[in-house]
Design a protein with these regions (language model features):
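P-loop NTPase catalytic phosphate-binding loop
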Residues: 304
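Extended, folded cores of ATP/NTP-driven motor/assembly subunits in large transport
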Residues: 1-301
C-alpha cells in the first residue's frame, strides 16, 4: 500500500511516558537542595518503614490506577520489579535513566559533575526549568490548537505541554512534579504571610501588591474548594556534540516560548534535579525549585 511505503523506514520520535507516585514525609517534602540524600548516611525515613503506612499508600495507588483506567482517556500499566531495577540480562528503568537511553543494550557510563556543566559519558546536558510563577503564562489550558495541522473547519488539539514533548525533536526528558502538601497548613501559612505583608505595606508598595496576590490566591482556594499544591517542570536535553547542544538549547527555549513561558536556562541545579528525577527518588526534589498553584493548573503542564 502506498501509505505503508510512505512511512516505511522513515525516522520517528521514540516517546515514552512514566507516572511515578512517591510517598514521602512532611519534613522531607520541605527539604532544600543542601539536604539531599547525597549528604546523609540513611536514605529511608523511619515513617516510611512502617508497614501500615506502606499498605495505605499501596491501596491509594491501586485506587488511583483504577480511576485513571476507568476514565477511558488514558491507560496505565504498572511496572514490574524487573522493569524498574532490571535483571542480569536486561537493564531496568533506573539503569536506562542513568545512561539516558531507552535501549535494552544500555551501558552504564561515568557521570561528570562540574560547576558549569554535567556530562554522562559523552553526552553533555542542558537544563531549562519552570520554577517560578513569574516564568509562567497568565493563562494555562489542558490543550492547545496546533496550527500546522488545523484548518478553518477543524482543530487539531494537542496537550498544552506538547511543544516540550512530542514537538521537541531532540533527545530530552520532560519532568513534571506535583507535590501535595497539607492544604490546610499551606493556606494558614499564606494567611500569616498576608498579615505580615499588610503590616509592612506602609513601608513598601510591593508589600501591598504581594498582599493582594496572596489574598486572591486564598479567595480562589476558599471559594472553589481548590487544593493548594506545589509544582515544578523542567526539560533536560542532551547531545554528544557541543555545537548541536547549542542548537538544542535554543530549540528548547523557543518551544517554551510557544507555551508563553519565560525560558530559564539553569546551569547550577542540573545535578540536584537530575538526582531528584531518578525513578522513585522524587522525594529528593529541592523545595526551593517549586511554585505554589492549584491541582487544576498544575496538571495542565502534563504531557500525554
Amino acid at each position: 500500500r502506498s501509505f505503508e511505503r510512505h512511512f516505511n523506514e522513515r525516522p520517528f520520535l521514540n516517546h515514552a511516558c512514566y507516572l511515578f507516585l512517591t510517598k514521602t514525609t512532611k519534613n522531607r517534602n520541605r527539604q532544600q537542595s543542601n539536604f539531599s540524600t547525597l549528604c546523609r548516611g540513611h536514605i529511608i525515613p523511619k515513617e516510611v518503614r512502617d508497614k501500615d503506612t506502606a499498605r495505605k499508600f499501596l491501596e491509594a495507588t491501586e485506587q488511583f490506577e483504577r480511576i485513571m483506567n476507568e476514565s477511558g482517556f488514558i491507560r496505565l500499566s504498572r511496572l514490574t520489579d524487573e522493569e524498574i531495577i532490571g535483571t542480569a540480562e536486561t537493564p531496568g528503568l533506573i539503569e536506562k535513566y542513568f545512561s539516558l537511553s531507552l535501549s535494552d543494550t544500555t551501558v552504564l557510563e561515568d557521570i561528570d559533575l562540574r560547576a558549569d556543566r554535567m556530562r554522562i559519558g559523552d553526552k553533555r546536558l542542558c537544563l531549562h526549568t519552570l520554577s517560578d510563577t513569574e516564568d509562567l503564562p497568565g493563562l494555562v489550558n489542558t490543550d492547545m490548537r496546533y496550527e500546522r495541522l488545523s484548518t478553518d473547519r477543524s482543530d487539531c488539539r494537542l496537550s498544552f505541554a506538547a511543544p516540550v514533548g512530542l514537538l521537541l525533536s531532540c533527545n530530552h526528558i520532560y519532568n513534571q512534579y506535583v507535590l501535595i502538601d497539607d492544604c490546610a497548613e499551606n493556606l494558614q501559612r499564606f494567611e500569616k504571610n498576608a498579615r505580615n505583608m499588610h503590616s509592612l505595606s506602609r513601608y513598601s508598595r510591593s508589600n501591598q501588591i504581594n498582599k493582594q496576590w496572596i489574598d486572591e490566591y486564598l479567595n480562589e482556594a476558599h471559594s472553589f474548594g481548590l487544593t493548594s499544591v506545589r509544582c515544578h517542570c523542567n526539560v533536560l536535553a542532551w547531545s554528544e556534540d557541543k555545537e548541536e547542544l547549542r542548537r538544542i538549547r535554543n530549540d528548547v527555549g523557543s518551544q517554551l516560548a510557544l507555551m508563553e513561558c519565560k525560558p530559564r536556562h539553569n546551569t547550577v541545579d542540573v545535578p540536584t534535579l537530575f538526582w531528584a528525577g531518578i525513578p522513585g527518588n522524587e522525594a529528593d526534589f529541592p523545595a526551593e525549585e517549586s511554585f505554589y498553584t492549584f491541582i487544576e493548573q498544575a496538571v495542565c503542564f502534563f504531557n500525554e
